[in-house]
Amino acid sequence: MSKEDNVINSFEEQANELMKERFQKLKELQSNGKDPFDVYKVERTHTSKEVKDNYEDLEGKTVTVAGRLMSKRVHGKAGFSDIHDRYGKIQLYIKINDVGEEKLKEYKTFDIGDIISVTGTVFKTKTGETSIHITDFQLVCKSLRPLPEKWHGLKDPDLRYRQRYVDLIINQDVRDTFIKRTAIIKSMREFLDNRGFLEVETPILSPIAGGAAAKPFITHHNALDIDMYLRIATELYLKRLIVGGFEKVYEIGKNFRNEGIDIRHNPEFTAIELYEAYADYNDMMEITENMIAYICEKVLGTTKVEYEGAEIDFTPPWRRLTMVDAVKEYAGVDFNIIKNDIEARTIAKEKHIEFKKELKDCTKGDVLIGLFEEFCEDKLMQPTFICDYPVENSPLTKKKRGNEAFTERFEGFVFGREVCNAYSELNDSIVQKERFMQQLKERELGDDEAYMMDDDFITSLEVGMPPTGGLGIGIDRLIMFLTDTHSIRDVILFPTMKPQPNNQ
C-alpha cells in the first residue's frame, strides 16, 4: 500500500468517527424541532460579491447571505467565521450580546461544511475586511460527511475526479477553470451567431457511426430491435442540413468514442462542428484563427497565453504549412520525389514507422501521415495549420486543386497537439460512394476505425449540396490551452472513471 493510500485510509477512518458525531448533532436538532432538511427556501438578498462590490451603499444596512461554512473562529462570547458561495467568500462576526447565549451556543455546534443563512448588518473590521455582523442565522443543510482539511487526504487525482463536488468546494482554481470553460463556450457561440450561423441539434443515437475514423459505442434499441451507435461526430447530419438550405450551421455537443483514456482523450468529449455553404477550407482557416482570437480576448483579455511554462500566441494569422513541407522540414524526407507506394514503404522501414495494418498494405499517403505523426507533430508548438492531407486518408474531402493526390483538408496544431480539423467538403455523391467503398476495404483489412457506408448521406448528396467548408474543434483540448491545464480530466467536470468496488 502506498503512502498516499495510507493517508486516504487514515482520513476515511477519522471521517467515520466525525460522521457519527455529526449524525448525533442532526438527531438533536431534529428532536428540538430544528431539522435543517425541513428548510425549503432561503430569502437571500445578496451574494458575497454583491455585498463587497456595493459596500458604500450597504454599510450599516441589513442583508441576508447564504453559503457553506468554511472556517470558524468562535471562542468565548464572540468570534469570526467565513462562508463561501458561488461568487467567493465573506466574513461573519457573531457576538453574544446580539444573538443571545442559546443562539451562540447553537452556532458553536456548527461544523465546517454546514450550509447556513445569515442575516446581519454590513461593516468593515479594523483591518478593512468587509464583514457581516450577525443578528440572526439558520442552519439550512447539515453536512454529514466532513471535508478534507485543505484537501489533505485527497491528493490522489482519481479521488478528486470521482468526488468533483468536494474538489469544487475546496479548490478555487478548479472552480475558476470551469467558470472559464463556460465563458469560452459562450464566446464561441457569440462569434458564430454574430456571423449569421444557426445553432442546431442532431441525433446522438444513430443507426450508423459516421463522420470520423473512430471506434463507436454500440447499444440496442429494444422497440426497433436494431443496434444503434452513440455518435462519434456530428458531420454527416450537419451536411444534410446544408443540403436542406441551412447555409451556415453549427452544433456544440457531446461525441463518444470507445477508445483509450489518457491526458488528451476522454471517451465522452465536447466538440463543435460548423459548416458554411459556398465556402472552402481557406475560409475555415480564417474562421478558426479569428474565433479563437476572439475567445482569448473576450475571456482572457489577450491572445498570448501561457501553457506549461511556454507562451502561445493565438494572434492571427497562424502559420500555414503543407504536410509534405512539414515532413521535409522535420523528417528530412521529400515526398515530392517519391514516385509510388513501394518507395514510400522503403522509407517507412528505414525510419522505423509502425502502422495499424501491415506495411505491405500501406499506401504512399499512409507513410506520409506516419512520418508526420512521428517526426513533426511535437515540433508544432505555436498555432499552425497543417494543410493538404493524402486523398486516401480523407474520405469526406474534396481533392486539392492542382494536385489530386491530396485533399483540401487541414488540421490545426498547438503545442504539438491537434485542436481542429477542417475540409473543403466533398459534395460529389459518386466520388463519395467510391470513397466509402474504399473505406469498407480498409475495414476488411482490420481497420475498425474506417468509415461505414451511409446510404442516406449519399442520397442527400444526390439531391445536391453546394460547395461547403466544414470545421471541427475539440473544445476540451482548446480549454486546456486557455486555462493552462495539463490533463483533459481537469477541464471535464465528471471525466470517465473506472467504477470502484462498493466498499471503497
From Swiss-Prot:
The keyword Protein biosynthesis applies. Its cofactor is Mg(2+). It comes from the Bacteria. Keywords: Aminoacyl-tRNA synthetase, ATP-binding, Cytoplasm, Ligase, Magnesium, Metal-binding, Nucleotide-binding, Protein biosynthesis. This is Lysine--tRNA ligase. Its main location: cytoplasm. GO terms for biological process: lysyl-tRNA aminoacylation. PROSITE patterns: AA_TRNA_LIGASE_II. It comes from Clostridium botulinum (strain Langeland / NCTC 10281 / Type F). It catalyses: tRNA(Lys) + L-lysine + ATP = L-lysyl-tRNA(Lys) + AMP + diphosphate. It is found in: Cytoplasm. Binds 3 Mg(2+) ions per subunit. GO terms for cellular component: cytosol. InterPro entries: Aa-tRNA-synt_II, aa-tRNA-synth_II, aa-tRNA-synth_II/BPL/LPL, Lys-tRNA-ligase_II, Lys-tRNA-ligase_II_bac/euk, Lys-tRNA-ligase_II_N, Lys-tRNA-synth_II_C, NA-bd_OB-fold. Mg(2+) 2 binds at residue 418. Its EC number is 6.1.1.6. SUPFAM superfamilies: Class II aaRS and biotin synthetases, Nucleic acid-binding proteins. Homodimer. Belongs to the class-II aminoacyl-tRNA synthetase family. Mg(2+) 1 binds at residues 411, 418. Disulfide bonds: none annotated. GO terms for molecular function: ATP binding; catalytic activity, acting on a protein; lysine-tRNA ligase activity; magnesium ion binding; transferase activity; tRNA binding.
